[in-house]
Amino acid sequence: MERASLIQKAKLAEQAERYEDMAAFMKSAVEKGEELSCEERNLLSVAYKNVVGGQRAAWRVLSSIEQKSNEEGSEEKGPEVKEYREKVETELRGVCDTVLGLLDSHLIKGAGDAESRVFYLKMKGDYYRYLAEVATGDDKKRIIDSARSAYQEAMDISKKEMPPTNPIRLGLALNFSVFHYEIANSPEEAISLAKTTFDEAMADLHTLSEDSYKDSTLIMQLLRDNLTLWTADSAGEEGGEAPEEPQS
């Protein structure tokens, strides 16, 4: 299928909310070897984030049920829940491995500018983070190191090449801070990164174009929400789940 046709079908699949189809079309487009435009890389991101988002949510529900049935000593439900959770986990790993393969084989090395490179390295950090959520033991440690390395490389480039209000730079800092808090168990680092990012963007807000204003201020609000949540947590109050960058 022609590249232009694949992109068109991915857009149709998005409108129909058939995200697995959308992801398959975008995967084929990436494998054609041409660099993606800004719109195309967003299509790729939205497709896979929706696919993996459903799997992550399902895995959390099943893990919670499994934990509860183990605590209750329920031999009736236990094996079935474990088996189904493992099935979802295998699917989730498969999607993450596919995305990481596309990033390493095509997208990162083909990125022609700093913004694209940061976008793809952030994506690499995100998909290693999703793998870390379901990993255990030595495997988890290796995956966490890979996520941290990708996020850090993206941060280094973004600080040199992009303004503090750039939505991609802000989204990267948001997700890296969530990684610090939820995966690496480093709440102080998470709070420090979120606060510094928010403060630097706030100081630079007057330079924002109308096009970027909505995207940037939305992510700044999420950074502030997380800071409120994490500060309450560290004060011993009941928190909740930290928001990360929105799907689209």
From Swiss-Prot:
Biological processes annotated in GO: cAMP/PKA signal transduction; establishment of skin barrier; intrinsic apoptotic signaling pathway in response to DNA damage; keratinization; keratinocyte development; keratinocyte differentiation; keratinocyte proliferation; negative regulation of innate immune response
Pfam families: 14-3-3
Predominant localisation class: cytoplasm
Induction: Induced in damaged or stressed epidermis.
Residues with Phosphoserine modification: S5, S74, S248
Highest taxon of the lineage: Eukaryota
Signal sequence annotation: none
Cellular localisation: Cytoplasm; Nucleus; Secreted
Expressing tissues: Expressed in dorsal skin (at protein level). Expressed in the basal layer of skin epithelium and in outer root sheath of hair follicle.
Paired cysteines (S-S): none
A GO term, aspect molecular function: protein kinase binding
GO cellular-component term (any): cytosol
Keywords: Cytoplasm, Nucleus, Phosphoprotein, Secreted, Ubl conjugation
InterPro entries attached to this UniProt entry: 14-3-3, 14-3-3_CS, 14-3-3_dom_sf, 14-3-3_domain, 14-3-3_sigma
Post-translational modification: Ubiquitinated. Ubiquitination by RFFL induces proteasomal degradation and indirectly regulates p53/TP53 activation.
Positions of the record's site feature: Interaction with phosphoserine on interacting protein: R56, R129
Family note: Belongs to the 14-3-3 family.
Subunit-structure text: Homodimer. Interacts with KRT17 and SAMSN1. Found in a complex with XPO7, EIF4A1, ARHGAP1, VPS26A, VPS29 and VPS35. Interacts with GAB2. Interacts with SRPK2. Interacts with COPS6. Interacts with COP1; this interaction leads to proteasomal degradation. Interacts with the 'Thr-369' phosphorylated form of DAPK2. Interacts with PI4KB. Interacts with SLITRK1. Interacts with LRRK2; this interaction is dependent on LRRK2 phosphorylation.
Miscellaneous comment as given in the Swiss-Prot or TrEMBL entry: 14-3-3 proteins have been shown to be PKC activators, but this effect could be non-specific and only due to the acidic nature of the protein.
Physiological role: Adapter protein implicated in the regulation of a large spectrum of both general and specialized signaling pathways. Binds to a large number of partners, usually by recognition of a phosphoserine or phosphothreonine motif. Binding generally results in the modulation of the activity of the binding partner. Promotes cytosolic retention of GBP1 GTPase by binding to phosphorylated GBP1, thereby inhibiting the innate immune response. Also acts as a TP53/p53-regulated inhibitor of G2/M progression.
Name by which UniProt lists this protein: 14-3-3 protein sigma
Organism: Mus musculus (Mouse)
